[in-house]
Amino acid sequence: MQTTQEIQTSQNPLERRIDMSLAVADIDKAVEARLKQMARSVKMPGFRPGKVPLKIVEQTYGPQARSEAIGAAVERAFGEKVREQNLRVAGYPRIEPKEAGSEGALEFSAVFEVYPEVVVGDLSAQSIEQPTLVVGDAEVDKTIDVLRKQRTTFEAAARPTQDGDRVTIDFAGRKDGELFEGGQATDFPFVIGAGSMLKDFETAVVGLGVGETKTFDMTFPEDYHAKHLAGQPVQFEVTLKSVEAPKLPEVDSDFAKALGVADGNVDKLREEVKGNLEREVKRRIQAKVKEQAMDALLAVTPIEVPKALVESEATQLAENAKRDLAARGMNTKDIPVQPAWFGDQAMRRVKLGLIMAEVVKGNELHAKPEQIRGLVEEMAQSYEDPSELVRWYYAQPDRLAQAEAVVIEDNVVAWVLSKAQTSEKSIAFDDLMGNAA
């Protein structure tokens, strides 16, 4: 067996090629050895197990034995060359047989990618903004209001409809004077302003009294999901059957009990809400800072990435998306989730993975046991029995590995912050929580 030095190809700076030459005589010996081994256990009609003549075994299994022998020899030759040259192979090699080889030899080329050299750039000019927010009574009040709205009940109202009411209607829609598919319903309930109906439709219903009928024109949005209606002018006739006004629960003992405060103490409820908010605010601020830190690393560390790793990551992201859809009860066979959809995300994740690995290795940022324990205990604080979650994490190594990965990311973020320019900026509660109007 002979191999030549790996060669960089011109198309891809990370692609390499190793040429290999395998002696036919060596392959023949390997084939014969495989056939003899197979003959010991192969079963054929008319022969006892292990008594089939080698010639007959060769006639039946010869091509399979030769293919396996060549595959094993190529794999062995490739592995030896990779170790000899200290190459870090990314993905699997593509084996290409050569049409014209030397006499008495089989010649192949192994084409593969290697991991890039990662040199993290200077972060001193990178700016990272750290949001700040102190959770106070106003934030607690807003959150309790959200919790109240989630428990809204409705009572019959003897007045015209207004925003927030739950109404029941009959309606019929016409396009060019003809009823269109999906445009009719009876005893149809919806909450005005909840967004379940088109805004123009909801607006037209406001001000109606029970028993009143209204006819109005509207135009479907250009991006409406029903293509035959997108951008089309239509006319609706609506009859109001009932109107119910929203009623929010009082913040009292019953409300507190409904939210898990056993003794119904409202002050205790506010304390729990504040504690949960502080944890959520911390988590969201950390996420914003982490994203900036990752962007900074990418900005100062331009690298080529192996296509094989990006393709593998995109495939994994697509599979994750399918599992998520299936968990929501959707039939993924009807939804053609393609790895290509995740190309940019996969590229970013692979780049960051390579860069972070270099940062961790070069700066000894591996997770310490006490850091992992601290993170797990912090996450457990939002549970009724924190010790149960801690035990759950420590019961399986793979669960603890997830916590370890988070700690390592936090260590990298802290390292970036120590190198970059940082500043603090107050952020509004609604902006941080995504509730801004």
Swiss-Prot record:
Q: What's this protein's family per the entry? A: Belongs to the FKBP-type PPIase family. Tig subfamily.
Origin species, per record, is: Azoarcus sp. (strain BH72)
What is the recorded name of this protein?
Trigger factor
Looking at the UniProt record for this protein, which Gene Ontology cellular component terms does it annotate, in alphabetical order?
A: cytoplasm
Gene name as annotated: tig
Task: Give compartment(s).
Answer: Cytoplasm
Instruction: Output one GO MF annotation.
Output: protein folding chaperone
Job description of the protein: Involved in protein export. Acts as a chaperone by maintaining the newly synthesized protein in an open conformation. Functions as a peptidyl-prolyl cis-trans isomerase.
- Which superkingdom is the protein from? Bacteria
